[in-house]
Each structure stands twice: as C-alpha cells, then as structure tokens.
C-alpha cells in the first residue's frame, strides 16, 4: 500500500516535497538529499 509523505528540510524545517512510498517495502523513514529553496542549497530532507 502506497502512502503520501512529506519531506521536511532537516536544517530549516520547511516541508518542501510531497512524495509516496510503499510502507511494506520501506518501513523506516526516508532520508534524501534535495534542494531547499529557502536556503538555496542541497540539504538532507527527512520524512515527516
């Protein structure tokens, strides 16, 4: 079952991206390096 998740910037805390994941295949939280427009650089985004 796929669920929608938000990716939150680890440094500024803003929710920048919306994505989906399969909870049965990936039960742990996702951590992805993505571009943060607020800080204008690539930061680690964590599932929230």
Curated annotation (Swiss-Prot):
Q: Name one GO biological process term.
A: translation
The record's listing under Pfam families reads: Ribosomal_L33
Which GO MF terms does the UniProt record name? structural constituent of ribosome
Note whether Heme occurs among the keywords: no
Q: Which UniProt keywords apply?
A: Ribonucleoprotein, Ribosomal protein
Note the InterPro entries from the entry. Answer: Ribosomal_bL33, Ribosomal_bL33_CS, Ribosomal_bL33_sf, Ribosomal_zn-bd
One of the record's GO cellular component terms: cytoplasm
- This chain belongs to the protein called Large ribosomal subunit protein bL33A
Sorted alphabetically, which HAMAP family does this protein's record hold? Ribosomal_bL33
Question: What top-level branch of life does the organism fall under?
Answer: Bacteria
């Amino acid at each position: 079952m796929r669920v929608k998740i938000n990716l939150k910037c680890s440094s500024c805390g803003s929710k920048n991206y919306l994505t989906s994941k399969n909870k049965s295949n990936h039960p742990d939280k996702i951590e992805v390096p993505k571009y943060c427009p607020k800080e204008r650089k690539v930061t680690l985004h964590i599932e929230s």
